[in-house]
Amino acid sequence: MGAYKYMQELWRKKQSDVMRFLLRVRCWQYRQLSSLHRAPRPTRPDKARRLGYKAKQGYVIYRIRVRRGGRKRPVPKGATYGKPVHHGVNQIKFARSLQSVAEERAGRHCGGLRVLNSYWVGEDSTYKFFEVILIDTFHKAIRRNPDTQWITKAVHKHREMRGLTSAGKKSRGLGKGHKFHLTIGGSRRAAWKRRNTLQLHRYR
């Protein structure tokens, strides 16, 4: 096995004495830093490489701290108006994962960079910590490489805002196989609309 395989096995056993100590110390360290800061290198190089990171110019790592827990509906004095079924304020669950929220915040902060992917690095009772891989699309090392030219195209601007990253696609219900029939046609809304629209074809 190569070195990265050993690192992968270490991270799989998070309850081991070594990892429990490491994660605890790192969480303390991350709490002292600002909620969004640049990391000098990936904490998990094996995971970062699997997600597309390369230790070369043009690649940047940002570490994000996201507060855990559900979402409270932002309404003044709890006045939601409308029917009682929609009166909920406190026990609202956000549709997207905290990882996709972290990607969005990194993308907003670094508007000139493109979000490639992200991964979990730790959590405690209050926060979750993620590292986001960003790419500088104007760097020659990125533009001249056939493997990374795709992300330099304008259609990939703020892909994290539109649910095009791996974490963003999870909450959209996209995938292959019989478990993902609700999103045939691109989205849940498209699938629902097609099934609930009466189409009377001319020849039948």
Swiss-Prot record:
It is found in: Cytoplasm. GO terms for molecular function: RNA binding; structural constituent of ribosome. Gene3D superfamilies: Ribosomal protein l15e (3.40.1120.10). PROSITE patterns: RIBOSOMAL_L15E (PS01194). It comes from Ctenopharyngodon idella (Grass carp). Pfam families: Ribosomal_L15e. NCBIfam families: PRK04243.1 (NF003269). This is Large ribosomal subunit protein eL15. InterPro entries: Rbsml_eL15_core_dom_sf, Ribosomal_eL15, Ribosomal_eL15_CS, Ribosomal_uL23/eL15/eS24_sf.
